[in-house]
Amino acid sequence: MQIPLLTPQKDPMGAAIADYFANGKASKLRVFSSMFDEDEIPVKQLFRNFTEMPALEQEALRMSEGRILDVGAGSGCHSLALQEMGKTVKAIDISPLSVEVMLKRGVKDACLENFFNEQFSGSFDTILMLMNGSGIVGKIANLPIFFHTLKRLLAPGGCVWMDSSDLRYLFEDEDGNLDIDIDDDYYGEVDFRMQYKNIRGNRFDWLYLDFQTLSLHAANNGFKAEKIREGEHFDYLAKISRI
């Protein structure tokens, strides 16, 4: 998968993170999609501490052990919480502005890196993918590449902690039946574009994955997925490990 590293001119989230870190406040981080109305991400939420995190995230951090890889680490909130627990973590992100903020905030090992880059190497006991961690896969068709990457980076006996959401509630009729065309793309495949002030990012694909589909594709690629906990908004935390 070719996911390019971002430049500051095309990195609205990184700019918002840098602004909030420098000034203690930020403007609207706007989110656009062809499927939904315009929305916004509260930038303060990207700087939450452990006690402010949802229960699913707290559980994943508590269960993380050994050498940990924090994928798409953003402002570094999860990595910092792990460090406070005395755990060893490497944080990666494709945003240079975010990586700069992480280092300034005290993340000991943060680097600019694409998770899917074949040149990125390491052996990790835990791979942490939170805040809809399945999102970076982009499309169902990319799941084999995702599992190939896990095989390359997971240490023997290692596991992935990943959260995601089932969007079926958006497509259910009054009787609870799924009202979708089976010839359409998978209903969890979404496109987004972000904007912060005058900085507009490129459109990107984002994957929301129901647990049954995750479990099926995991099994087809030599892994097993276990649903560890359910959230309050059709979200869940999964543990993924080699069979």
Tell where the protein language model's regions lie, with residue ranges.
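Conserved SAM/SAH-binding beta-strand->alpha-helix loop
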Residues: S95-P96
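Conserved SAM-binding strand-loop segment of SAM-dependent methyltransferases
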Residues: G106-N117
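A short glycine-rich, Lys/Arg-flanked "PGG" loop and its adjoining helix->strand segment in the class I
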Residues: L143-P156
